[in-house]
Amino acid sequence: MAKGLLIVNLGSPVSPETKDVRRYLREFLSDQNVITMPKALWQPILRGFILPFRSWRSATFYKHEWTQAGSPLIAYTQVTRDRLRERLPDWDVQMAMNYGGEYPIGETLQTMAARGDAPIVVIPLFPEYTQSTTKTILDKVAASGVKTVVIDRFYDHSDYQKILAQQIDDAYEAGAYDTVILSYHGIPTAMVRHGDPYQQECETTTAGVKQYLKKVPQTKVEMCYQSKFGPVPWLKPYLRNRLMELAALGKRNVLVATPSFVADCLETLEENNVQNYQTFRANGGKNFATVRPMNGCEPFCDFLAKLAKDKIAAEANHGKA
């Protein structure tokens, strides 16, 4: 009987073709943990307006970033899984995706359980907890009926914060930057008002990373939110707006890190490296660079392996108490 580890990421269309992107967006944007509007109101908007117009546009972006290995997010999650297998040779290490049809959470867990894996540790690859990512994963884990041990966030682990800080220091040293921005995926402010801890956890991540930075002056570090969707207010400051403000203030050299994304995806590759880069340059900015996400790097995989082993040890000690 082997211990099991399941890492879970958001997911991706199975191809960059419009029909597959439409199917993916329909699944993703129909999740009421993501869009909390009543279905009777939301579904006509989604099917009548958003999917017909957004699907082909998003498909264009996916085609820009698609690789021979497929979706970058899935490819880098596979790298993470494979490196975890090297670090945990006696474990059954698998990956799952929340949306998109490939690597379904429930089926993957049931297969692991049928092989006799016990206990099974589940790690959603989202450092900070929020309803629209972590909770929807945990709902599917619970619905599988498989007994699991869940690590639902890891933003406050010093080892994780040190890895982030080292990545930022390394990128900062390669250029002369006026400002370093830690940019997180945004969520609607209504979620925070209803008790979602995400904003506080992002702020804690930023504070933790700042204390481990060795080369970046803390006065140069700030945080923003990106990837706003729809007309309702989301967490501010918005990254795009802040980039325009910085350029207007003469801060023409900016480095952006994205702690809430552990693998490259449309938000890092298209939104930041293309759209936000173009916005910054069009408003007078000069140098715009990004810090690559973890992308299955060795230190991050070391961290995840230790996280899983420590969780099992803690559960065993708790059972003896």
Curated annotation (Swiss-Prot):
Q: Which GO terms describe its biological process?
A: heme biosynthetic process
Q: Which Gene3D superfamilies match?
A: 3.40.50.1400
Q: Which GO terms describe its molecular function?
A: ferrochelatase activity; metal ion binding
The entry's cellular-component GO terms read:
cytoplasm
Keyword annotations for this protein?
Cytoplasm, Heme biosynthesis, Iron, Lyase, Metal-binding, Porphyrin biosynthesis
Reported EC number(s) for this entry are 4.99.1.9
Reaction it catalyzes: Fe-coproporphyrin III + 2 H(+) = coproporphyrin III + Fe(2+)
Alphabetical list of SUPFAM superfamilies matching this protein: Chelatase
Family annotation (HAMAP family):
Ferrochelatase
Function according to Swiss-Prot or TrEMBL: Involved in coproporphyrin-dependent heme b biosynthesis. Catalyzes the insertion of ferrous iron into coproporphyrin III to form Fe-coproporphyrin III.
Protein name, as recorded? Coproporphyrin III ferrochelatase
Gene name?
cpfC
